[in-house]
């Protein structure tokens, strides 16, 4: 049976950075040094060969200008005395041969004396017989040699012979090989220095890369990108100059920024971002800024900015932020569910008490009183709860209203749901959360306005028609002063004293974000009435 292996084991792990760099640099060094070696060796070979040839030519020219050689060529080969002179020079300069010939190529000297008087062997002497110096590689009686030829002239500048000098080719090759070894050792030394430098470079790179391999860096980068784009919080990163270097999708949505449409570069965003969030203090002192509230394009954002350090040096900052309105919606949605649960719990205790009463009447066999009690209880439920659940189809809104009715009762006031109210459930959580925020704020404001003296009355009307929910909240409290009613929805304006006036501003913002509207009427000492209109997906939820 074949066992499956983990994915990481099946993947072929890329070559390590150190191995890759060493191999690449070694290959480049080897290629460069090989080319240098070939070129340099070729030049050294030519220079060595030319140097030996020039040395031989210098000796040949000296002999050609010698009076003894000129005079000797006027005699017979065996009587000329040239052999003794040539052999002395040959041995002194470690040459293979020195041959002096007349114009008929007859030898006047040779390392093998018996060949004196015989013709010179080789066609490479012909140029010299015609008055031209010549260098050639050829083989005579002795060995393969590098041979040079120089014409000999008398006092009247008439050519009377040729001096031929030979260098054993193996000697030339030996000198070239000796030079070649010095080149090879230089190349090997260069390779060694290059490898040592490469190892040092690899160590420096590994330190810069925190010991990570390239494929690990690639994996971390992909994971970082996936993480940044998957979180709901907006993320904006800046460098030590305050220039934006990174922005994730959530931040683009919250800031209404689209790179493909608004900017081809982040420079414009960097300028606007520095005006919205002051990161200079964070970059200068490294002091984090936490839980700051800023407003961007009618959105209330909760932002945290922290410095980014590398080796103790601040190299940038990261800001994370989230729509605070959304956070409040979630909290209010949770409050609605909690209120619904509390209302059910309270009603369960109430019904438990009523069941105990029914059980007691059964034991006492007071059937007439039992009948009256059950009928009264059923009527009360129908009036208070049954009618509400029949009109309000959203369990969350129903539970919320029940909790507010109970709260008003506990405070000695009355909260009434208008008999004409009808509210279908909505498929939009934003709409439900906004309605809970709106009703909660308006009802709580009304309860505070009614004060501790009991007997106040609050009425709520919810009417759905053609995709719109019309909501009215009335109370018979003290009303709103005329000088404040026009600014009642402004942030910081309140009838409850200082450090208040946020709730209605938030309600207005949420209602308008949905495309709705809110208005107020009030007559001091008589009433206050709020009118709210928001879109409501009631028809969609009933499909």
From Swiss-Prot:
Report the record's Gene Ontology biological process terms. phosphorelay signal transduction system; regulation of DNA-templated transcription; signal transduction
List modified residues, type Phosphohistidine. Answer: 349
Any additional notes? The region encompassing approximately residues 42 to 181 has been shown to be periplasmic, however exactly which residues are periplasmic is not clear.
> Gene3D superfamilies, alphabetically?
1.10.287.130, Histidine kinase-like ATPase, C-terminal domain, PAS domain
Identify the residue ranges that face the Cytoplasmic compartment according to the record. 1-20, 203-543
Protein's name in the database: Sensor histidine kinase DcuS
The cellular location(s) given in this protein's UniProt record come to: Cell inner membrane
Q: How does it sit in the membrane?
A: Multi-pass membrane protein
Q: SMART domains of this UniProt entry?
A: HATPase_c, PAS
**Entry note about domains:** The periplasmic domain is involved in C4-dicarboxylate binding and sensing. The structural disorder in the cytoplasmic PAS domain has an important role in signal transduction to the kinase domain and may be the decisive structural feature that characterizes the activated kinase.
């Amino acid at each position: 049976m074949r066992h499956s292996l983990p994915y990481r084991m099946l993947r072929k792990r890329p070559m390590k950075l150190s191995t890759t760099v060493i191999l690449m640099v070694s290959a480049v060094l080897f290629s460069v040094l090989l080319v240098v070696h070939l070129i340099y060796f070729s030049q050294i070979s030519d220079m060595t060969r030319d140097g030996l040839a020039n040395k031989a030519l210098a000796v040949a020219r000296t002999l050609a200008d010698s009076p003894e050689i000129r005079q000797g060529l006027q005699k017979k080969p065996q009587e000329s005395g040239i052999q003794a002179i040539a052999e002395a020079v040959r041995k002194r300069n470690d040459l293979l041969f020195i041959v002096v010939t007349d114009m008929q190529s007859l030898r006047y000297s040779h390392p093998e004396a018996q060949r004196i008087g015989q013709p010179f062997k080789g066609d490479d002497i012909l140029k010299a017989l015609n008055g031209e110096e010549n260098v050639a590689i050829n083989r005579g009686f002795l060995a393969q040699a590098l041979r040079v030829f120089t014409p000999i002239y008398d006092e009247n500048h008439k050519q009377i012979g040729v001096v031929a000098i030979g260098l054993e080719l193996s000697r030339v090759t030996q000198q070239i090989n000796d030079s070649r070894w010095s080149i090879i050792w230089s190349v090997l030394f260069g390779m060694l220095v290059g490898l040592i430098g490469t190892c040092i470079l690899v160590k420096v790179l590994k330190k810069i890369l925190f010991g990570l391999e390239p494929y690990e860096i690639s994996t971390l980068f992909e994971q970082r990108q996936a993480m940044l784009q998957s979180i709901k919080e907006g993320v904006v990163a800046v460098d030590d100059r305050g220039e934006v270097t990174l922005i994730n999708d959530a931040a683009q949505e919250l800031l209404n920024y689209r790179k493909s449409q608004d900017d081809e570069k982040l420079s414009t965003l960097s300028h606007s971002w520095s005006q919205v969030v002051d990161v200079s203090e964070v970059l200068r002192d490294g002091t984090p800024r936490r839980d700051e509230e800023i407003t961007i394009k009618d959105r209330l954002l909760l932002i945290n900015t922290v410095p980014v350090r590398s080796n103790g040096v601040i190299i940038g900052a990261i800001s994370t932020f989230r729509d605070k309105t959304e956070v409040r919606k979630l909290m209010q949605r949770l409050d609605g569910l909690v209120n619904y649960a509390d209302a059910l719990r309270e009603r369960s205790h109430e019904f438990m008490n009523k069941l105990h009463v029914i059980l007691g009447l059964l034991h006492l066999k007071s059937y007439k009183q039992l009948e009256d009690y059950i009928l009264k209880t059923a009527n009360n439920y129908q009036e208070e709860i049954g009618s509400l659940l029949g009109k309000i189809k959203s369990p969350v809104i129903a539970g919320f209203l029940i909790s507010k009715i109970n709260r008003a009762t506990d405070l000695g006031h009355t909260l009434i749901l208008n008999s004409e109210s009808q509210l279908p459930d909505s498929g939009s959580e934003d709409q439900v959360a906004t309605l809970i925020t709106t009703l909660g704020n308006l009802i709580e404001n009304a309860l505070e306005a009614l004060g501790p003296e009991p007997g106040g009355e609050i009425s709520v009307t919810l009417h759905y028609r053609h995709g719109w929910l019309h909501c009215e909240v009335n109370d018979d409290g003290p009303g709103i002063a005329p000088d404040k009613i026009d600014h009642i929805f402004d942030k910081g304006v309140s009838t409850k004293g200082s450090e208040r006036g946020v709730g209605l501003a938030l309600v207005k913002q949420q209602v308008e974000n949905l495309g709705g509207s809110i208005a107020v009427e009030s007559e001091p000492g008589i009433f206050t009435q709020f009118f709210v209109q928001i879109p409501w997906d009631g028809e969609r939820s009933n499909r």
